[in-house]
Amino acid sequence: MQAVFLARSRMLFLTSDGKPPARFSFYVASKEGTTGRNQVRRRVSRMNITFLLNGETVELSDVDPTATLLDWLREDRGLTGTKEGCNEGDCGACTVMVTDEGGAKALNSCILFLPQLHGKAVRTVEGASGPNGEAHPAQQAMVDLHGSQCGFCTPGFVMSMVASHTNGATDHDTQLAGNLCRCTGYAPIIRAAKAAEEHPVPVWVKDKPVAPQATSSMLPGSSDELAAVYAKRPDATLVAGATDVGLWVTKQLRDLDPVIFLNRCDDLKEIAITDDEIRFGAMVDMNRMGGALAGLHPSYAEMIRRYASVQVRHAATVGGNIANGSPIGDNPPALIALGATLHLRKGDARRSIPLEDFFIDYGKQDRAPGEFVEAVSFPRQTDRLKTYKLSKRFDQDISAVCGCFYITVSDGTVTQARIAFGGMAAIPKRATNVEAALIGKPWTHETIQAALPSFAKDFTPLTDMRASATYRLETAKAMLERYFLEDQGETTNVLEVSA
């Protein structure tokens, strides 16, 4: 019997011939215990990349497009301070700080592919301390205030704190929501984060991104270049933030090739706000989207804050959250309620469709081979939007139900209603029968009660691990009632009850 270690999947198998099991035939184990899966066949998407690691320039040739930063740090560079906990972007143990033209960001290295780092600066926990061993204020505060017990999660917390300290962020509950600790109860960690505020940002962590030239057509530098290469390779997987695709590799062990990375398409990162329209490019990350919406639709911005951790929101994109077609995505229902239009491109051809028409069925969207999401837009309008996210955990959890309501009233009569839900059907879906039961009726509690039976006409939700069908349906009804009560000035704030 021989042991075969598959580093990408963190699995150890005992086999008679020293070869990986058939299911994992695309892996080839090396003596060092790292994966050599690219020895099986020549990959289309291999590329050369350049970035900074803890202040030093790194140039990598012939890079596996789905090699994660976490694996590379630990196995190729011997930087084992960055830990693997969940390997899906939930626990924060693998957090690193990545600096690009938008500033310093905390990101999960377990679902961050190496080509996404091209031109950026990476700092790990080993690089948080100074050149002469000086502790970063976050590190020193964690020591002084007893923020570490077993220590496994500590490097991730430190790097989240280093990133927030670099940016001057002081909303520590939010900044650390993506880091889990099973020992401390969090109080000493929060105290450490607050204590670090009193100290200036060390000069050694003030990284600047590099500006290398493009090295591969699979790393397009604009939407025009993307359109050209995707038209030639419509079979390619598009990678924006990898918060979803990353799990295809780390959890499903899928072999992706070819892969096109969108991180250099700066024109897809534009936000345009005019008197008439609000438009988000497909590569706008969720943190930037939330910031742009804070003064326009604060309920939407708050929902985005709860949508996922800071690390995930820095990576997840507007376009990716739409294109994956998830029935439990939080972004599409809110956009549908705002009357959003989706802008798609294939080669030089462009088309625009109502966002709700993009979702056809579970796993099926109105997107042709070689076509990609370019932007999403919606009218600039008076804020009548409310979003309600129901999940088992308050922060960083998948919704059981996400309800979004935009109802306009004139002279006591409902003149317009756009209501959309996630978690209630196989796709993000409008409640058209409920809308019809409201429009033209008096804006009264009696009208709300009369509209509630229409929910059963619009939705037949499933029972799963997050909620039962009955619970989902009753909750959706309660959300409409909550919208009405809040519009009437009633207080419906959810109280946090301690155990």
Annotated model-derived regions:
Residues 86, 90-95, 103-114:
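Acidic (E/D-rich), amphipathic helical modules within compact regulatory domains
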Residues 27, 31-46:
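Short, Lys/Arg-enriched N-terminal segments with co-localized hydrophobic residues
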Residues 57, 97-98, 102, 106-109, ...:
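C-terminal structural segment of proteins
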Residues 71-92, 127-152, 165-182, 309-315:
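Immediate flanking context of iron-sulfur cluster ligation sites
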